[in-house]
Amino acid sequence: MPASPERILENLFPFYRQEEFPVLLHQYKMWSESRPLEGCRIIDASPVFRNTCAKYASLLAAGAELTVAVSPVMPYDSETAVLLGQYGIPVVEAERAGGPYDVVMDCAGALSHVPSRYGYVEL
């Protein structure tokens, strides 16, 4: 089971001021209440760095079942990938990602081979 979204955000605060990601914090608060993605399986392949964890916290707060994909076609911080594993968020190599997922959040076509039930988002 993934770590609570609250814990993920708390671990960001020593590195980033809340003023640096106000939209994601607002989204986090709104989605924590409404849970619009409850049970939705999402895979996300975008550059993975510590600040990306704010997006992951919002998706988890919304009820998403999140998997993060890393790929050589885009940069990622290996320490952050390890941290995600410690949070209980599955991290997979994009080229080995299966599916289907409800929503595929892709970047640079890293997940173009992964089937989606509802659609794709190119970031």
Segments predicted by a language model, with ranges:
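N-terminal ligand-binding/catalytic initiation module
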Residues: 1-123
